[in-house]
Amino acid sequence: MRTYLVTGGAGFIGSNYIHYMFKKYDNEIRIINVDKLTYAGNLENLKDIEDRENYTFVKADICDADAINKIFEENEIDRVVHFAAESHVDRSIKNPDVFVKTNVLGTLVMLNAAKAAWELPDGTFKEGKKFLHVSTDEVYGSLEEEGEYFYETTPYDPHSPYSASKASSDMLVKSYMDTYKFPANITNCSNNYGPYQFPEKLIPLIINNALQGKSLPVYGDGKNVRDWLYVEDHAKGIDMVQEKGRLFETYNIGGHNEKQNIQIIHIILDTLQEMLPEGDPRKELVSEKLITYVEDRKGHDRRYAIAPDKIKEEVGWYPETMFEDGIRLTCLLYTSPSPR
C-alpha cells in the first residue's frame, strides 16, 4: 500500500485532494495528513473520512523539523504532496513575515526530511519516491496583452510578498532537483474554486455576502483577469503528475477560463437569482446594487492566464468542469440547508 504524506490537508485544496484520492483509490492507498490548523484549516472538511483505517491526521507545523522528521521515521512515506502554505495576498501585504516562515522555511524542512528518509548511501534515492510541490501562477507576475500566457519557461516575476514566498519555495525545490537529483515535481496552478474554500477568497466571499445582502467589494475597476479552475480538476492534475509526470519537471495547471473579476461577480449573482426559489427571502437580497468599488490592492497583478499545453501533452490531463457548471455546483453548496 502506497503511503502519501499530504501537508495542509485540512485546507481548501488539500482537503479536496484527499477526498479525490480516496474516491479514486479507496483502500489501495494510505494518507497521512499533516496540518497546523491555522484559521484556513478545518477538519470538518474531512469529517466523512476521519474514521478510515487508511487515514491519519497529525497536527503539526511544517516548520517544526522534529515533528516532520518523526513522521518520516515512523512511516515509510512514498509520496509527499506539499500544499501547506499561507496563501492570501492581502494578509501577506500586512504581515509578510509569516509567509516567508511558512512558505519558504517550511518547504525547506519538508525537503530535508524527505531527502534524509529517501536518500541511499550512494547519493541516489529509493525507487518510487516522489515529492510534489504545489505552487501558484502568481510567481510569474502579470500579463498585459490579450493572447499572452504563462508557460513553464516564463521567467519568475513575483509582485506580492505571497508570490515572492512561493517563488522562493519553488526555487528551493528546483535547487534540490538540480543539486541532488531529488525526485520531485512542481505544479503551478491558476485560481481554484469549489467546496471548502475559506470565505475570504473572492468566489465564496461574493456568494456569502450576496446571500446576506452585504456589500460586494471590487478592487479598482474590476477588470483584473484570473484563470479559474474547479478544485477537483486541480486534484486530478496533481495525481496525474504524480503518476505520469517526468521527474524534475514543472507542470502548469490551468483551465482556460479567463474572467474579469467583475464578470465573476455578475455570473454569481445571475446564478444565485436563477437557483433561489420564489419566496426565499435571500432572492430579494441578491442584487447588482451590492457591488461596491474599493481602492485597488497594492501591487495588484492585472492578468493571469495559464497555458496547460505541457501537462495535456505529456500527462494527458484536461479540465472536466466547465466554469458555469462549477460555479453552479459551488453556489449550490452555499444555498443548501447545510452549506459548506
Question: For each predicted feature, which ranges?
Answer:
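Glycine-rich Rossmann NAD(P)(H)-binding loop
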Residues: 7, 94, 191-196, 218-226, ...
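Non-catalytic, hydrophobic alpha-helical segments
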Residues: 234, 238, 253, 264, ...
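A conserved structural motif in NAD(P)-dependent oxidoreductases
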Residues: 229-233, 322
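Mid/C-terminal beta-alpha module of Rossmann-like enzyme folds, strongest
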Residues: 244-296, 308
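Conserved small/polar residues in nucleotide/adenosyl-binding loops
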Residues: 334-340
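Hydrophobic "lid"/C-terminal helical patch
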Residues: 17, 238-242, 268, 327-331
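Glycine/proline-rich active-site loop of Rossmann-fold NAD(P)-dependent oxidoreductases
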Residues: 167, 185, 192-205, 212-214, ...
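N-terminal Rossmann-like NAD(P)+-binding domain of SDR-like oxidoreductases, especially those catalyzing
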Residues: 1-192, 232, 242, 271, ...
